[in-house]
């Protein structure tokens, strides 16, 4: 499936059919604001700009009308090949962005990387295209035995980009290391296999008055059946949609409450005082631990339980390179299942008082997890039977406890090494 982006306020492109792709996945933008996606069948041949306009209007006419109504402008009745004629000076979305950029908060972008130098290079290059004046980038290398990540940062020759090493494997450890050296009022996290939109930071800054901002994660490409299937399952954004929203502890909740129904660690930002308030990322959760993930989910939950708000801002979107094979997708879904139940154990450990609420919600949660809307639902296509729903979830609690034991052992070994070094130092300086 070919991935393309269309700006509706410009003349629409013609789409040629060369046999390489049978379908087209289109992201539509209206004065740079992403407003929706749709899938277009190409098997019938080329599409003229007018034909593409008709298809997009059928899929997104309502979203277009909503934006025009918000701007107090009469909505168009169709989308032609010439695009929409709208004066940008009177467009609220652009006016809000301009106001934010008058006094932009300083943002620290933390990229945790592990053995993906080519993807990291693309991510760093895309960050250099940001339409935002006040930011730094901190690359945290979780595999510092190689020089690839360090060399990529050095090659940029840009003082805004810094390299730091975190030799202890684990995404949470890398995140915590990045936070510890960040200078920004806001700390944003990006994965090394993602490419942020050029307005990503500007959109994050729109929500800088809340505790946390999270945005869309869209596909960078859909070249394989596994990538298409993952996106059809909801992708990283779980069909959150293209409408901004603010969530709080007092608002509507998901059947898996207090697990939030949104957000992913590959696209999230926190105010510095929020991170101080809720604490460090749990080092027994996340990639590189037996729990495989969920450190981001726990962080979102702690923000909400602290009485702070989380903004969902779809304009703050990034493009992600999904796993290309069913084997990789299977590992990913298995990790979601393990992480889900590990998350609940971690939450009870951090906030024991939630246990009563969890017990009351258990019947609804079980029904939800058995439905197609579940975040850990198994697709029917081509996945190994040993990764059937439920098996990973049963492993989650034990996986989290293993992570705690591993951390304790690692900390003890570090203490012992430190003690031996101090002893040798004293011996060398005695007498």
Regions found by a protein language model. Name each.
Residues 1, 6-22, 27-31, 36, ...:
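N-proximal low-complexity "stem/linker" segments adjacent to membrane-targeting elements
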Residues 124-165:
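Acidic donor-binding segment of Leloir-type glycosyltransferases
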Residues 263-266, 287-299:
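Acidic donor-binding loop at a coil-to-helix junction in glycosyltransferase catalytic cores
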Residues 187:
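Short aromatic/hydrophobic "clamp" motif used to bind/position activated sugar donors
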Residues 150, 166-182:
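Glycine-rich, basic loop-to-helix element that forms the pyrophosphate-binding segment
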Residues 233-260:
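Short, flexible, basic/aromatic active-site loop/helix in glycosyltransferases
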Residues 22, 199-236:
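Conserved donor NDP-sugar-binding/catalytic core segment of glycosyltransferases
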Residues 332-338, 352-431:
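Non-catalytic, C-terminal membrane-associated alpha-helical segments of glycosyltransferases
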């Amino acid at each position: 499936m070919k991935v393309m982006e269309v700006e509706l306020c410009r003349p629409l492109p013609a789409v040629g059919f060369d046999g390489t792709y049978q379908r087209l996945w289109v992201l539509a933008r209206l004065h740079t604001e992403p407003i929706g996606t749709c899938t277009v069948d190409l098997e019938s041949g080329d599409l003229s700009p007018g034909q593409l306009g008709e298809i997009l209007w059928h899929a997104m006419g309502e979203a277009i009308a909503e934006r025009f109504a918000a701007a107090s402008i009469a909505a168009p009745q169709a989308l032609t090949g010439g695009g929409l004629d709208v004066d940008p000076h009177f467009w609220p979305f652009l006016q809000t962005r301009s106001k934010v950029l008058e006094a932009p908060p300083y943002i620290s972008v933390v990229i945790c990387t592990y053995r993906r130098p080519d993807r990291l290079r693309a991510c760093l290059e895309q960050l250099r295209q940001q339409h935002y004046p006040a930011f730094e980038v901190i690359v945290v290398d979780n595999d510092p035995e190689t020089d690839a990540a360090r060399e990529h940062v050095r090659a940029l020759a840009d003082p805004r980009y810094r390299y730091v090493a975190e030799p202890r494997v684990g995404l949470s450890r890398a995140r915590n290391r990045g936070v510890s050296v960040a200078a920004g009022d806001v700390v944003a996290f990006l994965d090394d296999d993602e490419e942020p939109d050029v307005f990503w930071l500007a959109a994050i800054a729109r929500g800088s008055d809340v505790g946390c901002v999270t945005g869309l994660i869209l596909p960078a490409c859909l070249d394989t059946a596994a990538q298409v299937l993952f996106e059809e399952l909801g992708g990283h954004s779980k069909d959150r949609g293209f409408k901004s929203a603010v969530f709080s502890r007092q608002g509507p909740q998901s059947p898996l409450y207090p697990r939030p129904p949104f957000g992913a660690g590959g696209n999230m930002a926190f105010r510095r005082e929020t991170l101080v308030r809720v604490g460090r990322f749990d080092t027994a959760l996340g990639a590189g631990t037996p729990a495989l993930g969920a450190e981001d989910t726990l962080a979102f939950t702690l923000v909400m339980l602290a009485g702070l708000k989380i903004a969902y801002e779809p304009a703050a979107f990034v493009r992600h390179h999904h796993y290309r094979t069913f084997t990789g997708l299977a590992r990913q879904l298995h990790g979601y299942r393990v992480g889900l139940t590990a998350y609940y154990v971690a939450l009870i450990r951090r906030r024991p008082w939630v246990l009563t609420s969890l017990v009351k919600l258990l019947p609804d949660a079980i029904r939800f997890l058995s439905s197609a809307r579940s975040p850990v639902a198994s697709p029917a296509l081509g996945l190994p039977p040993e990764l059937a729903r439920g098996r990973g979830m049963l492993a989650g609690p034990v996986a989290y406890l293993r992570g705690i034991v591993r951390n304790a052992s690692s900390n003890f070994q570090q203490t012992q090494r430190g003690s031996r070094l101090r002893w040798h130092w004293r011996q060398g300086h005695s007498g």
